[in-house]
Regions:
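Short, charged/polar N-terminal "headpieces" of proteins
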Residues: 1-49
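Short, surface-exposed, charged amphipathic helix/loop patches that serve as local interaction elements
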Residues: 24-28, 37-114
Length: 114
């Protein structure tokens, strides 16, 4: 199959997180539209994290996330992706770390297959 150079430099990827809720850690899943960043950017972020260098995960998440699906509010209504909604999501403890880790794993698997 031929590689198609797409104009849309993003990809959808499932995210699974476990967040404290009523004395348990139920799994929550949704889909995130990640930006395809340069190889250098991805390597820099991954290397810093692997080397224990502090990384502003909220700032990274804001750079790499372009949208989402399957996120709802308390009443079950779909939450549209906006910068303000992303800020709200990133205020949840551990969320930025989970989102960045998922992006790194998704891009690493692509590199492994090539």
């Amino acid at each position: 199959m031929a590689f198609v150079l797409k104009k849309d430099p993003t990809f959808m990827w499932p995210v699974a997180v476990e967040l404290a809720d009523d004395g348990d850690y139920p799994p929550f899943t949704f889909k995130v539209r990640y930006r395809r960043m340069t190889q250098e950017y991805a390597r820099d972020v991954a290397t810093k994290l692997n080397d224990g260098i502090e990384v502003d995960l909220v700032a990274v998440a804001k750079e790499i996330i372009a949208g989402w699906d399957e996120i709802a509010d308390d009443s079950g209504e779909e939450v549209k992706f906006t910068p303000k909604a992303l800020d709200q999501l990133l205020k949840i403890p551990t969320m930025a770390a989970e989102l960045v880790a998922t992006w790194i794993n998704a891009t690493a698997k692509v590199k492994e297959k090539n």
